[in-house]
Amino acid sequence: MSATDLASLEKTIEAAFDNRDNVNMSTKGEVRDAVEAALNLLDEGKARVAERGADGVWTVNQWLKKAVLLSFRLNDMQVVKGGSGNSTWWDKVPSKFENWGENQFRASGFRAVPNCVVRRSAYIAPNAILMPSFVNLGAYVGEGTMVDTWATVGSCAQIGKHVHLSGGVGIGGVLEPMQAGPTIIEDNCFIGARSEVVEGCIIREGSVLGMGVYIGKSTKIVDRATGEVMYGEVPPYSVVVAGSMASANATMANGLPAPHLYCAVIVKRVDEQTRSKTGINELLRD
């Protein structure tokens, strides 16, 4: 699709979103066609909710998020087939794999293990592996990435190339508020089991999160070497574990020591060469 066509599509969706109270299941024509076209672009990886520039800055294509939201107003509930024992579901969003056969799976180039769930408009790149997991609409999963068992990739989340999302990992989805950016895991990251990254936070390239690390916008991310405290973004090639910090007030009103509060701790930073040659377990050793 040309830049002119994309601009026209964006204009139509922006206008429809501004007038969304009048968009419903009976809406036909240009608006419905534009939303369908946008969802197809997302589904095929030809457009992304967020894109990383050469300077490392992520730009959010809000109009694509708006297209996803408009689709809920346009589409009725329907039976979704494919459940265990010929059971069905009841939803507005069909499976990405609806009506797929061998040819479509071979062309896609990724592995989809039984009981993984991918909703339409999520893109899965070649050589990715989906264990029994959940990938929500508008998400992007990069080439060679492993989405392990019971991991969840939220709506519009952006997962880079050669990422490992370990068992039970949760990557938060962000559709609303509209101005919020999606949660982003950049290339070559390892996210340890049962960790959570939410609220539009960014884990920069090559970083390693140990098991059970929770990062949201209000989570303190502390560099142990410098004492620097940051929020919302883990720097490139950081090794991060769960920790705690002393409270600002050393004691409570009753005189007892104040409880320490959770934080994420950067225990070390490594360069790209070290990261590529060093095992994950070795990096996480103190």
Swiss-Prot record:
Q: Which CDD domains match?
A: LbH_THP_succinylT
Q: Which GO terms describe its molecular function?
A: 2,3,4,5-tetrahydropyridine-2,6-dicarboxylate N-succinyltransferase activity
**Its EC number(s):** 2.3.1.117
Localization, UniProt: Cytoplasm
Q: Which PROSITE patterns match?
A: HEXAPEP_TRANSFERASES (PS00101)
Q: Catalytic activity annotated for this protein? A: (S)-2,3,4,5-tetrahydrodipicolinate + succinyl-CoA + H2O = (S)-2-succinylamino-6-oxoheptanedioate + CoA
Keywords from the named record: Acyltransferase, Amino-acid biosynthesis, Cytoplasm, Diaminopimelate biosynthesis, Lysine biosynthesis, Repeat, Transferase
Name the Gene3D superfamilies for this protein. Answer: Hexapeptide repeat proteins (2.160.10.10), Tetrahydrodipicolinate-N-succinyltransferase, N-terminal domain (1.10.166.10)
- Quote the Pfam families the UniProt record gives: Hexapep_2, THDPS_N_2
Keyword Transferase attached: yes
Q: Does the keyword Acyltransferase apply?
A: yes
Subunit structure as annotated in this protein's UniProt entry: Homotrimer.
Query: What protein family is recorded?
Result: Belongs to the transferase hexapeptide repeat family.
Matching entries from NCBIfam families are given as: dapD (TIGR00965), PRK11830.1 (NF008808)
Q: What is this protein called?
A: 2,3,4,5-tetrahydropyridine-2,6-dicarboxylate N-succinyltransferase
In which organism is this protein found? Rhizobium etli (strain ATCC 51251 / DSM 11541 / JCM 21823 / NBRC 15573 / CFN 42)
